[in-house]
Amino acid sequence: MKHLVLASGNAGKLEELRAMLADLPLQIVAQGELGVDDVPETGLTFVENALIKARHASTVTGLPALADDSGLIVDALGGAPGLYSARYAGSPTDANANNAKLLEAMREIPAERRSARFYAVIVLLRHPEDPQPLIAEGSWEGVITTAPRGTGGFGYNPVFLDPVHGLTAAEMDTALKNRLSHRAVALATLQHKLHALSL
């Protein structure tokens, strides 16, 4: 496996994934660089959506493909925004609108009930018909702030606080965030599976 297509059109995700995969002996190519458009995410779970994206990119390019599907799960909101995190405030996706809607939904929720987690599923398809895709998941526990903090990252980063470090994901430097994040946990699990299979 010399080339790997990242099946995402999300610039923030692409930057994060490229940084996390930098040590692998692979040429990482974003799907857009190969003329692959985003595919509708019609799955009912994170795993289904990641598989849809990876299969689409692998089918179009003929290359192995890695896809992530992720979201923010807020306990007090019954798991919302969850699978619909990117489109929580409607389409087209708008991180500021999503954050504003989330903070409004959480306005009356006390501090002790503001628990949340980022959750990610990463899928690797070695070829379009791969019958045994490698699937890994990761989560990052935190709490929802009462106001945005920080300017780094993307998505819900300004409103997701890591209580251990006392920083939102948007306040962290890239190295710290890429060590703690749900995507980092999932990628570490995936890399372990790859080594176990000698890929």
From Swiss-Prot:
Its cofactor is Mg(2+). Binds 1 Mg(2+) ion per subunit. It catalyses: XTP + H2O = XMP + diphosphate + H(+); dITP + H2O = dIMP + diphosphate + H(+); ITP + H2O = IMP + diphosphate + H(+). Substrate binds at residues 8-13, 70, 154-157, 177, 182-183. It comes from the Bacteria. Mg(2+) binds at residue 69. HAMAP family: Non_canon_purine_NTPase. This is dITP/XTP pyrophosphatase. It comes from Xanthomonas campestris pv. campestris (strain ATCC 33913 / DSM 3586 / NCPPB 528 / LMG 568 / P 25).
